[in-house]
């Protein structure tokens, strides 16, 4: 089955969740019945990604990740906000799906996708997540510069897998999370930076850069961004998440929806970013990955996003996703 989008309105949310949780019951014997931590037994993980025959991305990736199980269970670390200290299953699933599945290809490269539930459209034109600008751009040229392709990750945690792998395919990648998690994130990025091998890499926040034999480059940075305080004191964004010119900005979030208290701060941050990027003449959208645990929390998130924050939320419908405990959502402003 080719992937399609299903636009969710207030009534459609209940139908969508009924279908997804029914599929969870159907596949219950094949799925792990846990919270989704990749490993509860080891502080050091090896995670590999291999292309399948016919995959649109041919590169393979091997990561060695240091996580902190003691910090996960601590009541003192990072003001008791500790889920980011370990690796959660949504991230490797999404990366494998985006890079190697036929359904993920349309999101990476852009293109036309069927949509259900929109009375005005039978299909949407998706902007590409991936794209390239060469290192030496002639600034004196009258030809408009090609748009940058940027990923801003909200709630990156300490793993660093998404940023290192996907920085191979975009012009700029900014990982954001709470301050207490950033040192662990930086260490994992540095340890696995050899997996960023298709581009030169520059950074203003990491203590190293890399040079490759290519005209392509990426900027890779790490930024403290707390949803509860974001945008309250100033309407200006940090320069790292402010595009310098016309850009396509993808906001990624993996497994950040797991209790009701985070829903409003996350959605407020997401909407502010999307609206500001659009007002500045950029193309912006978000992809959110959720592990389907408590149905009430997922329902509250989707309802709050659609009704209170008036965001356009589409479920990504794909047979590969249907067989898992994960949900992927494509989100834009109205």
From Swiss-Prot:
It comes from the Eukaryota. InterPro entries: Methyltransf_16, SAM-dependent_MTases_sf. Its EC number is 2.1.1.-. One of its GO terms (biological process) is methylation. It is an enzyme of class 2 (transferase). S-adenosyl-L-methionine binds at residues 88, 155-157, 177, 227, 254. The keyword rRNA-binding does not apply. Keywords: Methyltransferase, S-adenosyl-L-methionine, Transferase. One of its GO terms (cellular component) is protein-containing complex. One of its GO terms (molecular function) is S-adenosylmethionine-dependent methyltransferase activity. Belongs to the class I-like SAM-binding methyltransferase superfamily. RKM5 family. PANTHER family: HEPATOCELLULAR CARCINOMA-ASSOCIATED ANTIGEN (PTHR14614), RIBOSOMAL LYSINE N-METHYLTRANSFERASE 5 (PTHR14614:SF109). S-adenosyl-L-methionine-dependent protein-lysine N-methyltransferase that methylates 60S ribosomal protein L1. This is Ribosomal lysine N-methyltransferase 5. It comes from Lachancea thermotolerans (strain ATCC 56472 / CBS 6340 / NRRL Y-8284) (Yeast).
């Amino acid at each position: 089955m080719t992937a399609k989008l299903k636009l969710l309105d207030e009534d459609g949310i209940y139908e969508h969740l009924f279908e997804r949780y029914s599929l969870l019951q159907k596949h219950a014997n094949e799925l792990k019945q846990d919270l989704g931590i990749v490993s509860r037994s080891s502080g050091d993980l090896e995670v590999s990604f291999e292309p399948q025959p016919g995959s649109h991305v041919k590169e393979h990736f091997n990561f060695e990740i240091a996580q902190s199980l003691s910090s996960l269970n601590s009541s003192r670390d990072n003001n008791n906000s500790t889920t980011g200290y370990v690796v959660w299953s949504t991230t490797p699933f999404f990366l494998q799906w985006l890079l190697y599945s036929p359904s993920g290809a349309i999101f990476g490269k852009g293109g036309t996708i069927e949509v259900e539930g929109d009375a005005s459209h039978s299909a949407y034109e998706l902007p590409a997540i991936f794209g390239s600008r060469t290192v030496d751009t002639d600034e004196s040229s009258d030809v408009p510069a090609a748009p940058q392709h940027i990923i801003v990750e909200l709630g990156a945690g300490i793993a660093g897998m998404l940023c290192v792998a996907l920085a191979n395919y975009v012009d700029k990648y900014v990982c954001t999370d709470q301050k207490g998690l950033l040192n662990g994130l930086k260490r994992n990025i540095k340890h696995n930076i050899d997996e960023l091998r298709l581009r030169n890499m520059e950074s203003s926040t990491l203590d190293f850069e890399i040079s490759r034999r290519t005209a392509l480059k990426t900027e890779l940075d790490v930024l403290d961004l707390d949803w509860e305080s974001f945008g309250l004191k100033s309407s200006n964004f940090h320069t790292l998440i402010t595009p310098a010119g016309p850009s396509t900005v993808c906001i990624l979030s993996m497994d950040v929806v797991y209790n009701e208290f985070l829903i409003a701060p996350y959605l407020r941050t997401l909407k502010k970013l999307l609206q500001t990027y659009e007002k500045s003449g950029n193309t912006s959208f978000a992809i959110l990955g959720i592990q389907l645990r408590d149905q009430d929390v997922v329902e509250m998130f989707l309802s709050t996003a659609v009704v209170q924050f008036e965001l356009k939320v589409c479920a990504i419908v794909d047979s590969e996703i249907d067989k898992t405990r994960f949900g992927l959502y494509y989100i834009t402003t109205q």
